[in-house]
Structure formats: C-alpha cells, structure tokens
Amino acid sequence: MNNLRKKVLMMTMAAATLSAIAQQPVDYVNPIIGTNGMGHTFPGVCTPFGWVQLSPDTDTIPHNVNGAYQKNAYEYCAGYQYRDKTIVGFSHTHLSGTGHSDLGDILLMPAVGDVKLNPGRADYPEEGYRSRFNHATEKAVPGYYEVMLDDYGIKAQLTATQRTGI
C-alpha cells in the first residue's frame, strides 16, 4: 500500500513538473489584445526599456486638418487598429496604452515596383504605397511580428534589440 502511494505521488509530481516546463508566462502573451477601438496598444516589438518600439501603422490621421479637429485621430495614437485592412508603413517609436499621440513617427514601407510617394486611401490602396494585409498571415508574439503585405508579396518580419529595430 505504501509503495502504491509513493508511485502515485511520484507520477503526479512528474506530470506537474512536465506541465510547468511546457508553459512559460510569455506563452500566454498576445500583443494583439488592446489594438482595436480605444485600447491604444500596438502589436509590434520592443524590449523592456528599449529605445525602439517597432510596429506596423494601419493609418496616420492628423489631429488637425484646415483648423478642424479630426475625431478619429485619437483612435490611432498607437498607430494600429485591428479592424483596418491596410498597412501604411512601419515605424520605430510608439507609445502603448497611453491614450495620447506618440512620437511623430517616420514611416518605412517595403515595396516593389514603381515608387509611390502618396500613401493612398484605405479604401483604394492602389493609388499609393499602402498595402492590404490579412490577419491570417499576421503573427505577433513577444519580440517578433510578421505580416504578409498582399499588394507587394512581401513578408515583413520585425524584431528589436535594446537600441535598434530590424
């Protein structure tokens, strides 16, 4: 009887140990959470206290156009809205969760073909350099972001170090 108890206890401990090894806290992180509506978060990459917060931007809406406040600008203060179907570029500085505009990002956009200097409209991306994307090809995990830019056939992959984004 005593032997049976020891065996059951050891098997239970072994199973618990294997379960703990397979699951790390980082496995539960989903950077997409909070990227829609007024969540003001971005799905991109950064390191703790890093200089770079590299992430896609789905639109850039100015706060003021000809003296008129743009009410949708507030939704884009982190640069990314999950509901959007296009990416206008990737930038290296973002604030997450602040609810305030961020750092005057400079966009980079990989592309092939003719040079286009206008981002185009979300409803007609062909007139500019923005590209459609599909969430099925988007991957966001701590330290890594990937998305297929459908209009260019380019897989964009992002990661960051303490002082740079790649």
Residues covered by each model-derived region:
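Accessory carbohydrate-recognition regions in carbohydrate-active enzymes
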Residues: 23-166
